[in-house]
């Protein structure tokens, strides 16, 4: 019942607007409606007999109704006759169809045919007394005929109202059955004659509506669809009361509802208006009495049969219709509403709501266009701003990074340069200082040693040296020492020992030569030599001058010493002694020198006097310091007469009381062997003392230097 009532209510709403706006269309619709009602009333008498014939004829003329408004009533009658036998299933199934057709008006030829089938269902119900369903489905057919017969309906109502009042419902039903018994030709002719007046107008309007519907199907948005469907449901609920009043009052004009019209409902009203006009104009074609009887029959039929039939069919139909309506209304009602809205807009009948929606749509479109323009304008500005900010940030970051890198590199380079320069300066200064100190120490020590030794050696050795001692001792010892020590000196030379050995050798030669030379040499040369050797050894170890530089310095110093000593002390003994000292520079040299001395002493044993064997262990423990032993053998001479004989030498000789000298109280009978033993003893004692002192000093200085170096590295 809800679907049928909704259709009827929509018809009443739509009838208000077209009657006020275009009375001519309402007259045309009423004329066509009156004819339809007359024939339908006649059909109700004999609908079982002529159902098959009319169905065939309506099927033939159904395609013609899609092109013009004349064919629409014929299609409706044919559909009624076809569905008379299948009354109950057809009503429920076709109630669903009209709901879809109402939402899909004027979509083309196919939706028009569907609407005709919807009209067939109400005709069936009207014939049997289900009068509520009949007008609801007639409204669907009248959607196409509305524009055709509005003017004709008004004229027919004015002429036929007195006739309808006089006639009764029975006569109207008899007439309807008679008309149904007639051939389909008469039915079609009656429809055609009623619709001839507005046929041309209907065709033009339908063509326009079809074009508009095809053009606007895709334009309506989904949001409008949902809104329209909701409005249609509200209109249906509001208009149920008005439909009941129309059926009760049975007035010729449709009852209007006070509910506001939506664009979706306006279109459905436009489609369903002719059905109401037809329903009311049919009794006006004969009598007002017929109208009253028809109304009474409608009431009784609707209450009795409608409640029974519609209770089952409408409940099912409502469910299916609502489900299908919701699905179909989304796609089709929008097109229908848009089409009718455009048709009304052409005629100047747009409502305020439509104007508001149009204005809102325009505003939204304009706002969207403005937003698009603004976005297009803002995008380049934003991109430029981004580029500028990115460039500035990059520049700032690069500048900061450069500053940091430059500062860091400057610090690193400065630190490295400072370290390099400091190290270089330290190296250069140390090297220069070492060179200067070494040169100065060498010059001082060599000069002092040369002066002391040369002066003393010249006086003592030259006067004491004789042909015998030089020939015997010089040839034997010097030749043997040269062969052994010079070869060893070439293999290993140490600069630290050379300077000390030169001073010590000079001291030894001075001690062996004379007492004065021994005392002065011990005091002056030994002290100076120790200081010089210690300073030079420290400088050499710290600077690590190198073997080549040391060797060159040694050669120069030795050459100078050789020149002075050779010229002053004697060509043979002094030159050979210096060569021997140069070669004997290391520990093995010391041991070898001692061994050579022992060998030489053993070779020189003439009177059975044995030379003292030096302690090899002590010599090996000593640092590499060369030992110079000058064998200046003195032949027989008077010690008392000689002034240059050292006192220590004499004292040692007196204390030892050697067996050889026991018989000689005046020391006049001393031989060369005796002098040799004395010289060896004195030389060995002097060398031991000097070596011990120098070694201790060197060790202490080395330890102190190592500590200083470690502190610097830490």
Curated annotation (Swiss-Prot):
A motif (AKAP CaM-binding) lies at residues 74-94. GO terms for cellular component: asymmetric synapse; basolateral plasma membrane; cytoplasm; cytoplasmic side of plasma membrane; cytoskeleton; dendrite; dendrite membrane; dendritic shaft. Residues 243-268, 310-323 have a biased composition (Polar residues). GO terms for molecular function: actin binding; adenylate cyclase binding; beta-2 adrenergic receptor binding; cadherin binding; calmodulin binding; G protein-coupled receptor binding; GABA receptor binding; glutamate receptor binding. Residues 675-696 are annotated as: RII-beta subunit binding domain. It holds the Pfam family WSK. Residues 305-597 are annotated as: 28 X 8 AA repeats of V-G-Q-A-E-E-A-T. The modification Phosphoserine is found at residues 4, 22. Residues 1-146, 243-333 are annotated as: Disordered. Sequence repeats lie at residues 305-312, 322-329, 330-337, 350-357, 358-365, 366-373, 398-405, 414-421, 430-437, 438-445, 446-453, 454-461, 462-469, 470-477, 486-493, 494-501, 502-509, 510-517, 518-525, 526-533, 534-541, 542-549, 550-557, 558-565, 566-573, 574-581, 582-589, 590-597. Residues 37-50 have a biased composition (Basic residues). Its main location: membrane. GO terms for biological process: adenylate cyclase-inhibiting G protein-coupled receptor signaling pathway; amylase secretion; calcineurin-NFAT signaling cascade; cellular response to calcium ion; cellular response to xenobiotic stimulus; clustering of voltage-gated calcium channels; clustering of voltage-gated potassium channels; establishment of localization in cell. InterPro entries: AKAP5 (IPR042375), AKAP_WSK (IPR001573). Residues 10-32, 54-63, 88-100, 285-301 have a biased composition (Basic and acidic residues). It is found in: Postsynaptic recycling endosome membrane; Cell projection, Dendrite; Postsynaptic cell membrane. Signal peptide: none annotated. Multivalent scaffold protein that anchors the cAMP-dependent protein kinase/PKA to cytoskeletal and/or organelle-associated proteins, targeting the signal carried by cAMP to specific intracellular effectors. Association with the beta2-adrenergic receptor (beta2-AR) not only regulates beta2-AR signaling pathway, but also the activation by PKA by switching off the beta2-AR signaling cascade. Binding protein for dimer of the RII-beta regulatory subunit of cAMP-dependent protein kinase (PKA) and also for the protein kinase C (PKC) and the phosphatase calcineurin (PP2B). Each enzyme is inhibited when bound to the anchoring protein. Also binds the beta2-adrenergic receptor. Part of a complex containing AKAP5, ADCY5, ADCY6 and PDE4C. Interacts with ADCY8, and enhances its phosphorylation at lipid rafts. Interacts with ORAI1 (isoform alpha) (via N-terminus) upon store depletion and in response to LTC4. Does not interact with ORAI2 and ORAI3 paralogs. This is A-kinase anchor protein 5. It comes from Rattus norvegicus (Rat).
């Amino acid at each position: 019942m809800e679907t049928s009532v909704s259709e009827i209510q929509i018809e009443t709403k739509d009838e208000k607007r077209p009657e006020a706006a275009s009375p001519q269309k309402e007259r045309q619709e009423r004329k066509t409606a009156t004819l339809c009602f007359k024939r339908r009333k006649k059909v109700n008498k004999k609908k079982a007999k002529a159902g098959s014939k009319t169905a065939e004829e309506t099927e033939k003329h159904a395609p013609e109704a899609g092109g013009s408004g004349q064919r629409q009533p014929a299609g409706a009658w044919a559909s009624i006759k076809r569905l008379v036998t299948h009354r109950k299933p057809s009503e429920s199934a076709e109630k669903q169809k009209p709901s879809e057709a109402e939402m899909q008006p004027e979509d083309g030829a196919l939706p028009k045919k569907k609407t005709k089938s919807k009209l067939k269902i109400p005709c069936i119900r009207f014939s049997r007394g289900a009068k509520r369903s009949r007008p609801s489905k007639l409204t669907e057919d009248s959607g196409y005929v509305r524009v055709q017969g509005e003017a004709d309906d008004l004229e027919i109502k004015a002429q036929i109202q007195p006739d309808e009042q006089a006639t009764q419902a029975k006569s109207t039903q008899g007439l309807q059955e008679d008309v149904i018994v007639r051939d389909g030709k008469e039915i079609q002719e009656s429809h055609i004659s009623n619709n001839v007046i507005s046929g041309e107008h209907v065709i033009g309007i339908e063509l326009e509506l079809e074009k508009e519907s095809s053009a606007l199907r895709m334009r309506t948005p989904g949001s409008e669809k949902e809104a329209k469907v909701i409005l249609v449901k509200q209109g249906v609920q509001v208009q149920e009361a008005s439909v009941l009043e129309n059926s009760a009052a049975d007035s010729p004009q449709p009852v209007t509802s006070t509910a506001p019209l939506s664009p979706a409902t306006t279109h459905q009203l436009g489609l369903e208006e002719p059905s109401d006009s037809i329903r009311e104009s049919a009794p006006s074609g004969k009598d007002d009495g017929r109208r009253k009887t028809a109304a009474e029959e409608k009431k009784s039929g609707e209450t009795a049969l409608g409640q029974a039939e519609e209770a089952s069919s409408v409940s099912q139909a409502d469910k299916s219709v609502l489900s299908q309506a919701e699905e179909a209304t989304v796609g089709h009602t929008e097109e229908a509403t848009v089409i009718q809205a455009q048709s009304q807009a052409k005629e100047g009948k747009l409502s305020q709501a439509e104007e508001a929606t149009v204005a809102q749509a325009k505003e939204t479109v304009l706002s969207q266009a403005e937003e698009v323009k603004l976005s297009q304008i803002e995008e380049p500005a934003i991109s430029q701003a981004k580029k500028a900010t990115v460039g500035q940030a990059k520049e700032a970051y690069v500048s900061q990074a450069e500053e940091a890198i430059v500062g860091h590199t400057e610090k690193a380079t400065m630190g490295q340069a400072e370290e390099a320069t400091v190290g270089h300066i330290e190296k250069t200064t140390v090297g220069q200082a070492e060179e200067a100190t070494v040169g100065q120490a060498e010059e001082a020590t060599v000069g002092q040693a040369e002066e002391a030794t040369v002066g003393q050696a010249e006086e003592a050795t030259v006067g004491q040296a004789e042909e015998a001692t030089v020939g015997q001792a010089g040839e034997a010892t010097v030749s043997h020492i040269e062969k052994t020590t010079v070869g060893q000196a070439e293999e290993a030379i140490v600069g630290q020992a050379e300077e000390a050995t030169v001073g010590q050798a000079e001291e030894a030669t001075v001690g062996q030569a004379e007492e004065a030379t021994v005392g002065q040499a011990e005091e002056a040369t030994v002290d100076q030599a120790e200081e010089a050797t210690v300073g030079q050894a420290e400088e050499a170890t710290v600077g690590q001058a190198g073997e080549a530089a040391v060797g060159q310095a040694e050669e120069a110093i030795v050459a100078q010493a050789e020149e002075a000593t050779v010229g002053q002390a004697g060509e043979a003994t002094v030159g050979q002694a210096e060569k021997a000292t140069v070669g004997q520079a290391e520990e093995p040299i010391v041991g070898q020198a001692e061994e050579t001395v022992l060998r030489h002493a053993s070779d020189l044993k003439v009177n059975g006097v044995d030379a003292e064997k030096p302690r090899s262990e002590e010599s090996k423990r000593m640092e590499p310091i060369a030992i110079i032993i000058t064998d200046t053998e003195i032949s027989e001479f008077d010690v008392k007469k000689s002034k240059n004989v050292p006192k220590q030498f004499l004292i040692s000789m007196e204390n030892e009381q050697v067996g050889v000298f026991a018989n000689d109280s005046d020391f006049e009978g001393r031989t060369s062997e005796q002098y040799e033993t004395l010289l060896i003893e004195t030389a060995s004692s002097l060398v031991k003392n000097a070596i011990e002192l120098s070694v201790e000093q060197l060790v202490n200085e080395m330890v102190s230097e190592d500590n200083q170096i470690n502190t610097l590295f830490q």
